[in-house]
Amino acid sequence: MELKKGGIKEYLIMFFLLGVSGIPYFSSNQPFIILFALGLIGLFMLSSFSKIDEELLFVLIAILACVFFQAVTFSYFKGITILGLILRITTAYFAIKLLGEYFISYFLRVMIFLTIVSLIIFIPIFIKPDFLNTLIDLTPSFLSYQYELWGFQVDRKTMVIYNLLQEENRVRNNGPFWEPGAFGGYLVIAYIFNTIREKKLLGKINILFIIAIISTQSTTAYLALFAFIVCYIFFEDYSYAVKSLIIVFGVAGYVAFQTIPFLGDKIREENKGAKDAIEEVGGDTRMASAILDWDDIKGYPFSGRGLWPETRVDKKFEYVIRNNGFTNFIATWGILFFFFYFYWYYKGFSEFCRIYGASYYIPIVMLLIIWLLSFSENYFDSSFFWAFVFIGIPLKNVFYDEEIEDNNNLS
């Protein structure tokens, strides 16, 4: 794989951005998160950039306005939470400024590396599941992280570039991320960007991503990948014969959904068990989380209820888990900020699609797919996903030509 643009610094920026967003060894390490943000600020100050973009100011003003209104409404405010949010936002912004129009290229290259590593480790585990226990035993204790689950502290070991996560009934590829569904989501996003860039659904890089997506056994990732492929074929310049295959894909997808246990059965069980999940563990499924979030949304649909558990969660659900990122985001920030946030996503995606000549419907498809992915993961509060708010800044003055394509070459 040729690295024709940039050097080790740029790849480390992207890797650590993914790290603080979803790789537990980094995302659970508060001192590292702060040092990484300060490092980006320092690099920015040493660079040739002369000003802060107005987009960052718009976002910060909107955030502070929402927080002020919520603090007054609920008579509650915790400054450290807001400082953490601002840190994540500025981390995203400075990463975008330093990586520029090649942000997506660096993302794809790092994801290719992480995907290959994940498959090298996962395949032996899949063949012989006990190999995972061997890796855990061999991993030194300092390569570990802690998180809270239902009020209890949980310790996990990690190889950093592969998270040693154990599940009872299935062997799934979670890559370096906090769980397989999260890895699946990042892989689908990488697949989407690479498809638009290469203008083909089944290039060698995309085949690699598809294999890894299959290995995650993530229902949501499967549905998102299938939905994007169908939409891409429909909206791009494919023949009527190819577009007619959408019907075949649709029938095949429906059959798979009905017959493969971890697809249809998993979702049906979650729907049926949503009420019990709420009562027993405070919403530890996407449907139970959506129901709880909907109760919050109905009370404050426009302003949201804020980042603080004290303004969101009934005491009976003190250790509630809200893992439906879509409804959780609306419940937290309200409908008005929801549209503000994703307006910037749409602008950035539109610029990316313009550069590579994609249909003007594709940015909408990208947005819908990301919403679908978020139904099972809380993505939007992380620095990597905040970066999509600012992705249009370096892209708006870029025009497609052969020189850009050569510099952006992944092969």
Walk through the language-model features, giving the residues of each.
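Hydrophobic transmembrane alpha-helices and their immediate junctions
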Residues: 199-205, 209, 226-230, 234, ...
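Long extracytoplasmic/lumenal interhelical loops at the membrane interface
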Residues: 262-333
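N-terminal hydrophobic segments of proteins, predominantly signal-anchor/transmembrane helices
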Residues: 11-24, 38-96, 116-121, 368-372
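Interfacial loop-to-transmembrane-helix boundary motif in multi-pass membrane proteins
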Residues: 58-63, 95-146, 365
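Alpha-helical transmembrane segments of multi-pass inner-membrane proteins
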Residues: 108-131, 151-217, 222-234
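Helix-loop-helix junctions and helix-breaking kinks within/between transmembrane helices
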Residues: 24-35, 70-87, 175-185, 203-233, ...
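Transmembrane alpha-helices of multi-pass inner-membrane enzymes
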Residues: 38-41, 363-371, 379-411
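A membrane-periplasm/extracellular boundary helix in multi-pass inner-membrane enzymes
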Residues: 71-75, 120-129, 236-276
